[in-house]
Amino acid sequence: MIRIHKDKYFDSIYDELLEQATQEKYMDEYLLEKFMKRYFNGKCSYCEIRMKELRLTIDFYRPINGSLNTMDGEFHPDHYKWLKNEDDNILSICVECKRAKSNRFPVDGDVASINADKNKLVKERRLLIHPCRDYPERHFDYDESGMVYYKSKKGEVTVDVLNLNRGMLVEMRAQVYSEFNNLCYLFSMEQSPYYLKQILQEVQLDSIFIGLKKFILSEWVILNEKIPFLQEFEPLLGKRLQEEEVRVLSVRNNKISQIDIDNNILYVDNDKRRKRVPARKINDYYDVSDENALEKYYGKQRFIEKIEIYNFKSIRNMKIDFTLSKSSNAPWLMLLGENGVGKSSILQAIALTLMGNEQRQKIIKKKPYEYLTKGFDEGSIKIKLSGMQEPISIYLNSNSFEFTGENHQRPRVLILGYGSTRLLPREEMLSNYKVTWARIENLFNPFIPLVNVREYLLSLNNEDFNNVKKAIESLFLDEVIIDRDQIYEEVYFGFANSYSKLEDLSDGYQTIIALATDIMMVMKNRWRNFDAEGIVLIDEIDAHLHPRWNIEIVSRLKNAFPKIQFIATTHNPLSLRGLIDGEVAVLLENEEREAYITQKLPSQKGFNVEGLLTSKFFGLYDTMPDLNELFDRYYLLLSNPSPNERQKEEIKNLQDKLSKYEKVGTTLREQKFYEAVDYYFAQYRKNNVELSDEEFNNIIEDAIKYFER
């Protein structure tokens, strides 16, 4: 991270772009790219990754749709809406920093009052570094492994909130460290103008990781004493040094000679400087159940990044990458495959590793060796969580009667798990609503029911009831209003033309309602709003669902719980709707009947998954709920043998819209073929009967004649 110097105000040509950002709408990519290059050097303001490596978008330094103060876990729903048009509050951000930052804004002490002006905002003891107001170089050091280390409280909080030591960044920084360090070495050996030019090119504002490069350069100039403090370096290193050091270096630089270089002159009191370099240790410890360590819990967003499973049940050796999704919200992963290939085993492996020792002893009745793949004596599960350097590990041994491992004793995340059988509770069952961090019993025991929705909703205070009901209402396909009558102890669901009690709804409705309520019941132990964070595992997400809801379920859950990481399984392709590239993995079996996973699947751009559904994985056709209305209107117009001019124009407009989703062909050849096929389907839909072979052949012949002209 480096200091960014930008214009105080943005050009008015970007007003529409910034308005799109405030409303979280799709932004014009061309304008966005120009905006990023002009004001932010084409890089993320925080991690310095370039737009050619990762997609950039617009960030609001102080979040404008509610703010979570990570220092105390308090959510402020009305902060900082009044700053949405303040240019000083707008920065560039990559999708991964945006996902980590979310609506976090750490403040030491009281947050500013609603509608506070700049004079009052300045008094907020903000702990997130502002690249345009602070000097980030003073807060960070680096090493050859690519890790970034903080030198201040602000530095520590910023590293945590933005997850600046995430795997991809560490790997990229390590490579840049090696290359730039080698360049400095070559310059120190030869003092060649060529290498000096190379160094200066590497620290141009649009170059990657300038903060890291400035650190390396300062090490060579100041600590290693191999490179003189040249005039060209003063604007680069000035903010990393104390004023006295800059003055001393500048004075001595005027007296420099080749003899001085050869004799390796000592430029500053390095013993004094070394004392300022902190002990390089990252404190990963935190515990979701520890009331005295909530700052550490709220300070980082934690998702599963990677998992390695070795000799667990039917899985011999499997690695899964959860970082392929580039969503700015929580990443999903849908495990797709036939029954018996190990989908459920993956969910159980995750739950077993993350639930914490207390829940493991309470829920898991099997011994560790009973989970081993038949014929093997050792196994393991390793999960890498974002924000943690070391994985959480569980070891399985044929001689062990207790689960062993590393970092697995305490719960690190809120986690819920549901098996393929999700029973509703019977009235006579005793309810248990005590605080819990892991609710995964149903994943291991199908007879453990979901929450008693009516009883639970009636038990909530008004604030909690309103939060839970909003989440449930957002899952329904039709508009619904949930209400309760605490005198008569009933919960009602008001639809457009009916008013029903919970027990009068269909089993599918009741199951979805119970699932959402179950999730909220656990999440509210740490979170007070819809931005709850955690991990939810669902086996056979399509179970009990009507096909229409099946198509919508992912989008609905993403909307209701945008910050929760869902890992689900299905063998129904309709459940893929709402997922983006990197959020689907297919489980298959090899010739030895061993399960393996593939995540290299056709792109889901515009959610065109026809290639997947007609591939060796399925061989089914696909439907897009977003486009149903377009297709309905398109086929209706095509079914008219003599459309008027207005209808012809509408057909052309619909074809243009469908072309954006590559639904009417991308070449002239494809377009004529699609026209023939669409005409066929239009007649079929109109008459509800198939065209004869002769009629269909005539359509194809017309298309052929077109190319013969």
Curated annotation (Swiss-Prot):
This is Septu protein PtuA. Disruption phenotype: When this gene is missing the Septu type II system does not confer resistance to SpBeta in B.subtilis. It comes from Bacillus mycoides (strain KBAB4). Keywords: Antiviral defense, Hydrolase. GO terms for molecular function: ATP binding; ATP hydrolysis activity. Component of antiviral defense system Septu type II, composed of PtuA and PtuB. Expression of Septu type II in B.subtilis (strain BEST7003) confers resistance to phages SBSphiC and SpBeta. May be an ATPase. One of its GO terms (biological process) is defense response to virus. InterPro entries: AAA+_ATPase, ATPase_AAA_core, Bact_Antivir_Def_Nuclease, P-loop_NTPase. Disulfide bonds: none annotated.
